[in-house]
Regions:
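Mobile, glycine- and charge-enriched loop segments
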Residues: 1-5
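S-adenosylmethionine/decaboxylated-SAM
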Residues: 8, 13-167
Length: 167
């Protein structure tokens, strides 16, 4: 699927950048983090930040996958509303910015734009971000993606569908 292709392209970019701090915003299920856990062989330890999606099997699925790898994964789940999670992410990034960010979901166009703005604030220079194809395909989300491009487009190089590298 195009979503799987996007994840594969993002994994290649993460490997090239040898990323060690990854953030997923708008966590819907374990598919993105699972793809990271399966592919990640470029670092001894990787920090994964995500939003708690309330799914009890989420942790066990990731733990099972992680057992088959030599990488030490530190999964940090942020709990709360989109605003609370954004605030927590901004605080975490004050110490050290993120290398890679994946926006997996958003409840509205406004929420997506605000997630993009948080990404811009917490992503390091040369860092990569992606907006899930599943999000981009929703009619309502086009406006947010367009607004993001208008505001920050000059700061990013688009290197694939929904894949951006911060300059």
């Amino acid at each position: 699927s195009s979503y799987e292709q996007q994840l594969a392209s993002f994994a290649v970019a993460m490997r090239e950048g040898a990323v060690t701090r990854i953030l997923e915003l708008g966590t819907v299920d374990e598919s993105f983090l699972a793809s990271v856990v399966r592919e990640a062989d470029w670092a001894d330890s990787i920090e994964l930040h995500c939003a708690d999606n309330g799914d009890d099997s989420f942790d066990s699925k990731l733990t099972t996958l992680a057992e088959n790898t030599s990488v030490d994964f530190n999964v940090i789940k942020h709990i709360g509303s989109e605003t609370e999670i954004s605030d927590a992410i901004i605080q975490v990034a004050e110490a050290s910015r993120f290398d890679a960010i994946f926006i997996a979901g958003a409840t509205s166009s406004e929420a997506l734009l605000s997630a993009c703005m948080v990404c811009h604030e917490v992503l390091r220079s040369e860092g990569i971000m992606a907006i899930s194809i599943a999000v981009r395909e929703q009619d309502l989300m086009g406006a947010a993606v367009a607004s993001f491009r208008d505001m920050f487009g000059d700061s990013y190089e688009e290197f694939g569908e929904g894949l951006f590298r911060k300059q």
